[in-house]
A protein has these predicted regions:
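Alpha-helical linker/edge segments of TPR/alpha-solenoid repeat scaffolds
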Residues: 73-77, 101-115
Length: 115
């Protein structure tokens, strides 16, 4: 717990010094998720996406965050947009991870539709 708080403080300070640093926002958002601060993490991920739509890693993590908060359509949109960007950038591994996430969310919600 203390280690996570220390990371949070260091990353927050880095972001204060460089408020437009997409990596700092992304890294801080990941640590905020670990600290159960999903709303703050979502705001940072969305800021990265708005400022730097080519930042490929944000699509998977923001999609997962949307899933956890029952924003299924937003999650689908993130995964789909991420897949398109990964194709454009020839990032096969990331594309595959996003496709798996999209397939899982579609299967989970198809199961819910039949209940």
């Amino acid at each position: 717990m203390a280690e996570n708080q220390s990371k949070l403080k260091r990353l927050a300070e880095l972001l204060r010094k460089n408020p437009n640093d997409s990596f700092a926002k992304f890294a801080l958002a990941l640590e905020l998720i670990k600290a159960d601060e999903s709303k703050k993490a979502r705001v940072l991920f969305e800021s990265v996406l708005e400022q730097d739509p080519e930042y490929l890693g944000v699509y998977y993590h923001l999609g997962k965050l949307y899933e956890r908060t029952d924003r299924v359509e937003d999650a689908r949109s993130m995964y789909t947009r991420g897949i398109e960007l990964a194709e454009k950038k020839n990032e096969e591994r990331t594309k595959h991870e996003l496709e798996e996430a999209l397939e899982t969310i579609n299967l989970d919600n198809d199961d819910n539709d039949t209940l």
